[in-house]
Amino acid sequence: MITGNGADIGMTSLAEDCGPVLAWLQTQTGADRLECLRIEKLSGGAIQENWLLKLQIKGGSHDGHQSWVLRTDAASAVAVSNSRSDEFRLLRAAFLQGVTVPEPLYFCSDNAVLGQPFFIMTAMPGQAQARKLVRSSGLPEQGLELVAQLGHIMAKLHSITPQTKFKTKGLGSEELLFFLPRYEGSAASFQIAQMRAALDNLGTAHPVLEYSLNWLEDHLPIWADAASPALCHRDFRTGNFLIEDGKCTALLDWEFAGWSDRHEDIGWLCARCWRFGNEKLPVGGLGTFSAFQKAYEAASGQLLNVTAIGYWQVMAEIRWAVIALQQAARNNSGQELSLELALSGYLVPEMEMNMLNLIDEIEQGIWADLDS
């Protein structure tokens, strides 16, 4: 039996008719009875939609009260983002490797259920709002331990390579990430080519971004590493992980994950655009780089190339600027009218200033330590 009596719902498509999803979930869980207590659209997620489902399940594989999240596509998406089926596989691989992520439960490819693919994962406790996190009263005491934990989590993630096989129940070893594209040469040169193509597709002139890409290309011998790629989140930053009592409970939003140089994730996490005004704490505005580096190197058994991180920070500013322009284009084209998306384009000058300042610091030889 399925019931939605008493559900706390808003006026949105899923909340207006959750019956097909609940029927599908009852089949997946083998439940005798599944009652929806609450449906709530979660904030954030400019590229995907996330819905909190509070369920009471009787019988089957998940008997009892459950808090799950349904994740599906927004009205339009950034072209380079992974599909929901691919993101589910990525989340499953990370979970099996012991990365701190929500447990992925079920994937639905039947468009008759919701109109588009979606997956279900466990809801995790914690706060993700970046500006609240970087201004937390407990940050001075908890920041060092928190960024050390982030270093351990990232090292665990980067232990996944294209050769990694995952042990799954009843299936033996399985290669879950077969779908991820591989690149020739270095991740750095591959990223430059991707950003150039993205700018060309926008059809508007952005000379600062073009200059910065040229500068990165001119300096490839310094920061490009053709070493074996690792699985990188590629959006590992404050705002994409949940924090509860000073500890990370889950790394979220895997739509950009793929093979890359592990320094890309570190440059992204430490980029100025993701410090949210907390400039003196380079690791996402939360803590020092030295604490992060010590934990990462201890957990991974690999030393970091700190010089390369500066160049990856420039790339991070470029990439976020391109994504912001793409998001603004989604609004401007009429695909998805949203004030948040429209305002994204106005963030680009700040990123351009960040990349120019960083290039200047590197060229003058005064960029040497992220904590300085």
How would you label these PLM feature ranges?
Residues 263-301, 315-334:
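Active-site activation/catalytic loop segments of kinase-like enzymes and analogous catalytic loops
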Residues 40-211, 215, 219-228:
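ATP-binding pocket architecture of kinase catalytic cores
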Residues 231-233, 238:
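Catalytic-loop of the protein kinase fold
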Residues 2-32:
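Juxta-kinase regulatory segment immediately upstream of eukaryotic protein kinase catalytic domains
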Residues 252-257:
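Activation of the activation-loop gatekeeper triad in protein kinase-fold domains
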Residues 303-315:
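All-alpha amphipathic helical-bundle segments outside canonical DNA-binding/catalytic cores
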Residues 229-231, 249:
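Conserved protein kinase catalytic-loop anchor
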